[in-house]
Curated annotation (Swiss-Prot):
Keywords attached to this entry: Cytoplasm, Hydrolase, Nucleotide metabolism
One CC-aspect GO term: cytoplasm
Organism: Neisseria meningitidis serogroup A / serotype 4A (strain DSM 15465 / Z2491)
PANTHER family: BIFUNCTIONAL DTTP/UTP PYROPHOSPHATASE/METHYLTRANSFERASE PROTEIN-RELATED (PTHR43213), BIFUNCTIONAL DTTP_UTP PYROPHOSPHATASE_METHYLTRANSFERASE PROTEIN-RELATED (PTHR43213:SF5)
Location(s), subcellular: Cytoplasm
Named cofactor requirement(s): a divalent metal cation
EC number from the UniProt entry: 3.6.1.9
Record-annotated membrane-spanning stretches: none
Protein name as catalogued: dTTP/UTP pyrophosphatase
Classification via Pfam families: Maf
Amino acid sequence: MNTLYLGSNSPRRMEILTQLGYQVVKLPANIDETVRQNEDPARYVQRMAEEKNRTALTLFCETNGTMPDFPLITADTCVVSAGIILGKPHSQAEAIEFLNRLSGKQHTVLTAVCIHYRGNAENRVQTNRVVFKPLSSEEISAYVQSGEPMDKAGAYAVQGIGSIFIQSIEGSFSGIMGLPVYETVSMLQDLGYRTPPFIRA
């Protein structure tokens, strides 16, 4: 089997891995995602991915009495605008605030990936730069009313309606979605796990 454990509830991360041909088993990895005072954004996403991995791994071991037979992947994504971390908005008002902040400017999207396999772990942070067109208040209001921004870092989905706001991307589309494919597969290979199933099809 080409099985992976995914410590995430993100349908986007699940979609990315299943498209590569992996059988994905979801594990809960609920943690406190509060940003520490003056915490560096790259360190923040790395810490989140690592804490999710530890949480999911501990729960798996407690439930099954053994370590996972397959790699456990966790990830975290944040949007950074002018040095300020924009996570998932907690309200429509906050989503509007985030989108006004991103309007007409460049921002950074950081995604950290942590993989644990057979007692070894790999961690990487992948960086992307995105430029938004200037947004009108009507566009922002209509987008927020669609509901799409409410469970997305930075209050937009690169693969959804939010794509109409994007002028340019420098980096990885899948990384902005929440799981950079190139880095993730490279980490799996470095840990000695099999290449994506489609390669041997």
